[in-house]
Amino acid sequence: MEAVKTLIDRYGLADPATQDIGVFTNPILQQLYDQLVADGSNSLADALRVGAAIEEIDILDLEERIAQTDKADIQLVYENLMTGSRNHLRAFTSTLGKQTGDIYQPQYLDPIAYEVIVTSPTETGSGGQGRGQRQGQ
């Protein structure tokens, strides 16, 4: 999230984050958050499904945002976030299968795009983008 904060500061944008966990300034995000927390609170399987759904939404949102900018620094941060979301999607769906025997069905992604992601190996990002956070390099 440090990289996002750096971009917010660099471009003089208002920071929409609050200090309170689970509190959003955007009412649409707040409603989505509240619904997903309620949906995921029933069982481990439901929590894992909600986690996977969140990652699907994030991937689609990031793809849209990448296409809307020509700024390389913003694209890099979005691409790194998308790498994380794909890895998280793999983890949630894999854990769902191992822990419950359930097979996750994509809720937002195209089924082919989903299958490409979950059958691909775990990805690595660009480290700390030159801020000394790359391990072993």
Language-model regions: role of each:
Residues 1-136:
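All-alpha RGS (Regulator of G-protein Signaling) helical domain and cognate RGS-like helical scaffolds
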